């Protein structure tokens, strides 16, 4: 060790001194308090969406009133931002628990990219959602970021789970609860994830450690906007951005997002971007070459409860949908989408539902709490618009539940046509290393263009 | 928020990126905790050259730890010295900033850290 004496036992002492006492009591206590200070995972899974403003880091997101910016939005950039806030950010905040419960299986191409990274590499996952890509490669350190504080709260749960010292007990309980398939769990399968972009027909529903994993993994997560990232430029070895950029509503912003990713990685570092494809001939969504590329895609939070709680009264349908051209294809696309979604939703949701995050004590009316409790100012604009646009579709796939109880959220998507992603990489002063198509998605691995002289700045 | 992560973060404000004052961010009113994480020697040894050591020294000092040596340990040091490896692990991976603020030394903007998660969303006038 010689001259290199790091803060040793004294460091631990200092930590202990400064730390909240309860956080140090035990591993379990530490993990619990670190991931969701106020309480159990149950509370987190349901409470984040419900009480966003009360849930720590969630405040800033929901605190931005969606009605403010549109009224003052005079420049296109601000307008695009406001649009995305209403039709992407707020939606994810609202559907975070359900969304998270359906997202656990990595896309193969992404997993392959991650596994190709060297031990000790430092990577970024921009738009990490619930953090399903954290821990795929256990020998890299990854920092995930997402615009949605509620999703980041889920990702943080995952981080804590992944880094726990080996304890079979908790995991075994989860598995048992899952296999048991209690009634309670069945009642959880209310979500109908209509967007298939982060698909997951996963046989393995364990969100925490992957099956067979025995290495503890260190990762981290934070809340950030993809266009204003807090990462020091040129420091990361690699970055991924999966099913994120298609949520940006202008081409300029999509290209800028790729530019930001490239700036984060060192020279030679690689960035993988994955977006929903326009060409989905194999899927039942009905989208294909030549179709409309800018769409609002519904996410239906279904309730199968006989007596759902009332949804909060919409404050107003103040957020009139702009850009009407983006909805022109709804009639033709949504029915198929809804059907697809239902099938996918049932398949996906059944094994996992919220059981992973809250194995036993989910309130019966969880879905409605989530659907309606996110804060009217936040979700109603999207929801109201959704009702107007997708109401009939929602009914078609409800059948076994009260249609009126379903909460429909619209998410904006830009469907990439063949070649467009590569064009955007070039426009972002990047170079395409490789690219491909995987189950309704285009992907690209990009790096800095060799003549990019802005790397130094 | 791990100390490790802090070593890769700067201010989210565009104008601050080019300023040396924006890195590292300065912890303020930090409440720390220590996670119990299994050590991954291979990862640590390979991560070491990716660490900005000077920034780590600053962060470490600001968090109240004893001053780090001026020079980082070498991979060989780490490989041969288990105690050193463990110390590095404790500092980088296990030490968590649970609550507090991260302050940009350039623009002065403060980012909140709550429940161990830092929030870098900017108010509209800073975007």
From Swiss-Prot, chain B:
Coiled coil: none annotated. It is found in: Cytoplasm; Nucleus. The keyword Nucleus applies. The keyword Cytoplasm applies. GO terms for molecular function: protein heterodimerization activity; protein methyltransferase activity; rRNA (guanine) methyltransferase activity; tRNA (guanine(10)-N2)-methyltransferase activity; tRNA methyltransferase activator activity. GO terms for biological process: maturation of LSU-rRNA; maturation of SSU-rRNA; positive regulation of rRNA processing; rRNA (guanine-N7)-methylation; tRNA methylation; tRNA wobble uridine modification. Keywords: Cytoplasm, Nucleus. Residues 2-123 form the TRM112 domain. GO terms for cellular component: cytoplasm; eRF1 methyltransferase complex; nucleus; tRNA (m2G10) methyltransferase complex. It holds the Pfam family Trm112p. InterPro entries: Trm112, Trm112-like. Gene3D superfamilies: 2.20.25.10. Belongs to the TRM112 family. Heterodimer of mtq2-rmt-1/trm112, forming the eRF1 methyltransferase. Rmt-1/trm112 is necessary for the solubility and activity of the catalytic subunit mtq2. Interacts with trm11; required for full tRNA methyltransferase activity. Interacts with bud23; required for full rRNA methyltransferase activity. Acts as an activator of both rRNA/tRNA and protein methyltransferases. Together with methyltransferase mtq2, required for the methylation of eRF1 on 'Gln-182'. Together with methyltransferase trm11, required for the formation of 2-methylguanosine at position 10 (m2G10) in tRNA. Together with methyltransferase bud23, required for the formation of a 7-methylguanine in 18S rRNA. Involved in biogenesis of both 40S and 60S ribosomal subunits. This is Multifunctional methyltransferase subunit trm112. It comes from Neurospora crassa (strain ATCC 24698 / 74-OR23-1A / CBS 708.71 / DSM 1257 / FGSC 987).
